[in-house]
Amino acid sequence: MTATKMNAQEIIQFIANAEKKTSVKVTFEGQLATAVPSSVVKLGNVLFGDWKDVAPLLEGLVENQDYVVEQDARNSAVPLLDKRAINARIEPGAIIRDQVEIGDNAVIMMGSVINIGAEIGAGTMIDMGAILGGRAIVGKNSHVGAGAVLAGVIEPASAEPVRVGDNVLIGANAVVIEGVQIGSGSVVAAGAIVTQDVPENVVVAGVPARIIKEIDAQTQQKTALEDALRTL
């Protein structure tokens, strides 16, 4: 299976060297007494920027000193992914960090969490509440079920990430442990905990997960994906 495009040391250095930011949106009443620096965006009576740059402007308010601060992070090293150029369906409420790759016609459902360095292949669906940890790889035309967890590996840096092949179905609330590889065409049953590599074209189930059968025509029919859900 393919290696991740960012290895653990590269991600660690990316986070360590990134400027830590507390991004805020501030709505205020009154007139700012000082000029707005280039690091802050002002649209009407709304300011966007890092708190360390915005806070001094609020101290200079004259007249009414009313303002509301909205923030969702503190000293964050990794911003959220800019999704505007992604050719995929991404539903509201999905949390996707920067340095994530998403293939064409993938589907990212609400409540899913995708960490830095993860890679999602074309046509793959990440269902509601699923978690892809750092550097996790999912191939093409696969399905990661609701609430499933693909464990992430950023530290220790020597550990291997989860790798999921093409045309794989991972059932709801399944857990795939760090370093495990799931072969293409396989099915992981709902609630399974996968602690060892899974070969291609088998069904695994249980805690810990074990092979219970090879993929047959009936299994393929029951686990077939719906292309219509991936239409943009």
From Swiss-Prot:
GO molecular function, one term: tetrahydrodipicolinate N-acetyltransferase activity
Pathway, per record: Amino-acid biosynthesis; L-lysine biosynthesis via DAP pathway; LL-2,6-diaminopimelate from (S)-tetrahydrodipicolinate (acetylase route): step 1/3
EC number(s) stated in the UniProt entry for this protein: 2.3.1.89
Gene3D superfamilies named among the record's database cross-references: Hexapeptide repeat proteins (2.160.10.10), Malonyl-CoA ACP transacylase, ACP-binding (3.30.70.250)
Catalytic activity: (S)-2,3,4,5-tetrahydrodipicolinate + acetyl-CoA + H2O = L-2-acetamido-6-oxoheptanedioate + CoA
InterPro entries in UniProt: DapH, DapH_N, Hexapep, Hexapep_transf_CS, Trans_hexapeptide_repeat, Trimer_LpxA-like_sf
Keyword entries, A-Z: Acyltransferase, Amino-acid biosynthesis, Diaminopimelate biosynthesis, Lysine biosynthesis, Repeat, Transferase
GO biological process entries: diaminopimelate biosynthetic process; lysine biosynthetic process via diaminopimelate
Pfam families to which the protein is assigned, alphabetical: DapH_N, Hexapep, Hexapep_2
The keyword Acyltransferase is annotated on this UniProt entry: yes
Keyword Protease (UniProt): no
Protein family membership: Belongs to the transferase hexapeptide repeat family. DapH subfamily.
Chain's role: Catalyzes the transfer of an acetyl group from acetyl-CoA to tetrahydrodipicolinate.
PANTHER family according to UniProt: 2,3,4,5-TETRAHYDROPYRIDINE-2,6-DICARBOXYLATE N-ACETYLTRANSFERASE (PTHR43300:SF10), ACETYLTRANSFERASE (PTHR43300)
Name of the molecule in the record: 2,3,4,5-tetrahydropyridine-2,6-dicarboxylate N-acetyltransferase
Organism whose genome encodes this protein: Streptococcus pneumoniae serotype 4 (strain ATCC BAA-334 / TIGR4)
